Amino acid sequence: MIVCKLTYYHRNGGDYLIIDDSIKFCNLLAEMIKEANLSNVKFYTALGIKKPYFYDILSGRVNPPPPDRQIAMLRLLDPKPEQITLFFDLAARERNEVPADIAKTLENKDLCRELRNAIDYEKLLKNGEYKNER
């Protein structure tokens, strides 16, 4: 089992999760495949990806796969709840993107409207960044 140093901070009514930079997506993926009792061949075959690409992902030579492929991976792995968020967070960090689960959730137009109603655009446009300070 991969041990990941996670630190939670409670500030201004919200939890902030800090992920230890030493853990990589490729390490987590390898551990999750092992925990699911899948062989590498069975995993990449079921996923429909080529062997060289899979081993490039597993070695960390390439960035984690795109969001749709991440979701397909998780369907095969049947992960624990805490592994799901870590999986998406690590992939997003290495891809320099918003985590796939959050990006998919933001496809809900009603939720986007609610989020935008909560944004202080004056602060955002003035400072160039926005930190929710509730």
Locations of regions flagged by a protein language model:
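Recognition helix of helix-turn-helix/homeodomain-like DNA-binding domains
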Residues: 48-64, 90
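A short, Lys/Arg-rich alpha-helix, primarily the initiator
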Residues: 2-38, 125-130
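Residues within the alpha-helical elements of helix-turn-helix
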Residues: 35, 46, 76
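Short alpha-helical "recognition helix" segments of helix-turn-helix
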Residues: 40-45
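DNA major-groove recognition helix of helix-turn-helix/homeodomain DNA-binding modules
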Residues: 67-85
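C-terminal regulatory/oligomerization modules of transcriptional regulators
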Residues: 112-134
